[in-house]
């Protein structure tokens, strides 16, 4: 029988989309990405710089539950 995997799927959400007014956005909503992380190597929350299509620029995306 196989062991439980160490890799889990996490969701990354743009931190600037939540606080930006609607006039600055190209479209309503929040930018989200899904990715995998290794639970053993990175036990803390993931934080990556990714492209946000709503704001049309690179922003910090943080892991959400």
Swiss-Prot record:
InterPro entries: Ribosomal_bL33, Ribosomal_bL33_CS, Ribosomal_bL33_sf, Ribosomal_zn-bd
Cellular component aspect of the GO annotation: cytoplasm; ribonucleoprotein complex; ribosome
Region (Disordered): 20-42
A GO term, aspect molecular function: structural constituent of ribosome
A GO BP annotation: translation
SUPFAM superfamilies from the UniProt entry: Zn-binding ribosomal proteins
Keywords assigned: Ribonucleoprotein, Ribosomal protein
Family (UniProt): Belongs to the bacterial ribosomal protein bL33 family.
NCBIfam families in UniProt: PRK00504.1, PRK00595.1, rpmG_bact
This protein's name: Large ribosomal subunit protein bL33
Protein's organism: Prochlorococcus marinus (strain SARG / CCMP1375 / SS120)
């Amino acid at each position: 029988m196989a062991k439980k995997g160490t890799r889990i799927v996490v969701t990354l959400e743009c931190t600037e989309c939540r606080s930006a007014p609607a006039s600055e956005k190209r479209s309503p909503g929040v930018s989200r990405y899904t990715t995998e992380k290794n639970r053993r190597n990175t036990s803390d929350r993931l934080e990556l710089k990714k492209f946000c299509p709503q704001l049309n620029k690179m922003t910090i995306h943080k892991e959400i539950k």
